[in-house]
Design a protein with these regions (language model features):
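Cytosolic ends of transmembrane helices, especially the final helix of ABC transmembrane type-1 domains
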Residues: 212, 223-225, 240-244, 250, ...
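Alpha-helical transmembrane segments
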Residues: 42-50, 85-97, 197-211, 241, ...
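A hydrophobic transmembrane-helix motif
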Residues: 34-37, 41, 48-50, 81-84, ...
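Membrane-integrated ABC transporters
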Residues: 1-46, 55-75, 89-93, 97, ...
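ABC-type nucleotide-binding domain
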Residues: 357-423
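Short intracellular "coupling" helices and adjacent cytoplasmic loop segments at the cytosolic face
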Residues: 63-66, 98, 108-135, 227-251, ...
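Loop segments that connect adjacent transmembrane helices in multi-pass transporters
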Residues: 210, 214-267, 355-359
Length: 423
């Protein structure tokens, strides 16, 4: 789970069952197909707007009032179509997000609340902290952002191939002279868009890669703080009886201090990244015009062609700059998916340990018609290996009463956990 590729693959292994689960797959594939179809529609509308942009500025340059009025009605049709498509796409996307989240939450809860694993998880897998927060918050972030990323990547790919052809045709050729070598570069604006987006993406990754770890740490600290508040509420009576308010306040103050430290680390990373992204945002509307300006000044294209070319360049550059625009969200998503995957890996370890043959494991056999509770060669040890009970032999008959006595920490409660089959 150390690379984005392995993180995506691990999360897909955990969460992709939604598209094959009985009772879910038909709706899942219908919603997915709807998103793809609406993505194609939106790109078609964007191409329609690009053509309208050319015609409008050409008519404006010619002061053709009749054509301008006609184009106003065309614009109304474009805006109306775009509004309907975006609204439907939003509805489909949100339904897919909530359905996927509900399925993954139910699967995780079922694995967590089975055979005492919710107890064993805290005892045997201490690195998996706050499973409740992972189920409630991290699954939500993982599924919602995954759907958003899938939608935006699809939109980028469709828009890229659509407007690459438009930009290639509009670019023409540019004569290049390097020393004594002269040649014509076809589709020069396409290469400019690719270079611009590639440089921006590399700089974004270099400045923002630390955000993934910072986001993971911050979410862990947020979960620790929530867990501390929940524990104080659940043990309110005991805290009051022991006059433990001061200790609880100190514990919560420490959690809040750790949260602030993690927040500050994340803020510094986001600040460094924003220096680049804000600069690129200011340059975004200007660079396409500068790149297309030589053809306009050379009289090869009219004003409408200049604006159409600039818009096509912006569309290609936007498609290639997905990482620049989404890196902060990607860092947040990566941190949440890691936490969800680690929870499932820990549950898998517990399931495999329960199924694997082990002579040292406590085996509980339930006999409904027996009047005896038998313990044979029962040994109970702490997770660190310290023995609490060694080879206990006990026979308890119905309705005998038994008192288990011993010092605190001697294993009285642990014996009951062993009998219940959760140790």
């Amino acid at each position: 789970l150390d690379t984005p590729h392995s993180s995506v693959r691990a999360f897909a292994a955990v969460a992709s069952g939604y598209w094959t689960a009985p009772g879910y797959r038909l709706v899942a594939w219908s919603l997915t197909g709807g998103m793809v179809l609406l993505g194609v529609v939106n790109v078609g509308i964007a191409l329609w707007l690009n053509i309208w942009n050319r015609d409008f500025f050409n008519a404006l340059d010619k002061k053709d009032t009749a054509q301008l009025m006609q184009l106003v009605w065309v614009l109304a049709a474009i805006v109306g179509s775009a509004g309907v498509a975006v609204a439907i796409q939003l509805h489909v996307k949100r339904r897919l997000q909530v359905n996927w989240r509900a399925w993954l939450s139910q699967v995780t809860i079922r694995r967590w609340l089975t055979a005492g694993r919710q107890y064993q998880l805290g005892m045997l897998a201490e690195e998996v902290d706050n499973p409740d927060g992972r189920i409630a918050e991290d699954i939500r972030v993982s599924t919602e952002l995954a759907v958003e990323f899938a939608q935006s990547i699809l939109q980028c790919v469709l828009q890229l191939f659509t407007f690459l052809s438009v930009l290639w045709i509009l670019s023409g050729t540019m004569p290049i002279r390097i020393g004594g070598l002269e040649f014509d570069l076809p589709g020069y604006m396409v290469w400019c868009a690719v270079a611009y987006a590639l440089i921006g993406s590399l700089l974004t990754y270099a400045l923002g890669r630390g955000l993934i770890h910072a986001g993971n740490v911050r979410q862990s600290r947020e979960a620790d703080f929530r867990s501390g508040l929940t524990r104080a509420r659940e043990h309110a009576e005991g805290i009051a009886l022991m006059r433990g308010e001061v200790d609880e306040r100190e514990r919560l103050r420490g959690s809040l201090f750790d949260l602030r430290a993690a927040w500050n680390v994340q803020t510094r990373g986001q600040g460094n990244l924003s220096l680049l992204t804000s600069s690129l945002a200011y340059l975004a509307p200007i660079v396409p015009l500068i790149v297309a300006l030589p053809r306009y000044l050379g009289g090869e294209i009219a004003l409408g062609g200049l604006m159409q070319t600039a818009q096509a360049f912006s569309s290609v550059q936007w498609s290639l700059s997905w990482l620049i625009d989404n890196f902060p969200k990607f860092a947040e998503w990566r941190a949440s998916t890691d936490r969800v995957v680690h929870l499932h890996l820990a549950l898998t370890d517990l399931e495999e340990a329960a199924e694997a043959p082990d002579d040292a494991r406590i085996v509980v056999h339930a006999a409904t018609e027996s009047d005896l509770l038998l313990m044979r060669e029962l040994g109970v040890a702490r997770p660190d290996g310290e023995m609490l009970v060694a080879e206990a032999e006990v026979t308890i008959r119905r309705p005998e009463r038994v008192l288990i006595r011993g010092q605190s920490g001697s294993g009285k409660s642990t014996i009951m956990r062993a009998v219940a089959g959760v140790w």
